[in-house]
Amino acid sequence: MNRIAQTFQRLKERGEKALVAYVTAGDPDLDKTREILVGLKEGGVDILEIGVPFSDPTADGPVIQAAAQRALKTGTTLSRILDMIQDLRKIIDLPVVLFGYYNPIYAYGTERFAERAKAAGVDGLLVVDLPLEEAEELRGKTDSKGLDFITLIAPTTSEERMCRIARRAQGFIYYISITGVTGTATPSRDNVEREIRRIRTHSDLPLVVGFGISTPEQARELASLADGIVIGSAFVRLIAENADSPELAARVSSFAREIKKAMQE
């Protein structure tokens, strides 16, 4: 059982839900990203989702797009991110999921990437612009290294396609709670509840809800429907607002603690 499965099992036994936190690697720089990730762990985050910056992040809203541009300007690369994760593994045992686009992985080399990601301590991969039908080559490489290939299901996903995605899912299923890009709308509880029931008929894997969750109240409400939630834009916005502050990691940690507390109420 890998770190992702162990985490969901442990949380289930405790009657808790997973807080998955997304940050863009290299924003404001990789040294501070490392400090932020440590702060997230101290704040009670259960799974770290580390974004690989890309120049054309079509699934991301303006907050994360801006973070990607800042990270690229500081020279952040996939190779340097993997180095950071490997260094982070000396002090953090939380599951790490890489979130990004296919282009940087393709440019790096899929086999080389899978080997390096495994060696660095990555547990899962979510490639937002790689549909199921086009993922087999990369997935073959990641499967051979024991990395979970995490898949997305959206409100617009048909029943037939949902069934196919669910059958091939690993680690957990990521349900996109809104149509559009990250951080730009608020999910409807009724819609999310209905879609989660639909997904659960096709898979027993843990299910997390992401996109549009930014407050403790939203976290509490949506966590009650799923096995966990993902918060991204709210963390990235907080990082941007405090990038030059010596209290950056502490403020991110405090916000994580506030979210996690709300999820337990």
Curated annotation (Swiss-Prot):
Gene3D superfamilies: Aldolase class I
A Pfam family matched in the record: Trp_syntA
One GO MF term: tryptophan synthase activity
Pathway noted in the entry: Amino-acid biosynthesis; L-tryptophan biosynthesis; L-tryptophan from chorismate: step 5/5
Reaction it catalyzes: (1S,2R)-1-C-(indol-3-yl)glycerol 3-phosphate + L-serine = D-glyceraldehyde 3-phosphate + L-tryptophan + H2O
Keyword Amino-acid biosynthesis recorded: yes
EC number: 4.2.1.20
Enzyme category, top tier: lyase
NCBIfam families membership: trpA
Family: Belongs to the TrpA family.
Listed name of the protein: Tryptophan synthase alpha chain
Organism: Syntrophus aciditrophicus (strain SB)
Recorded name of the encoding gene: trpA
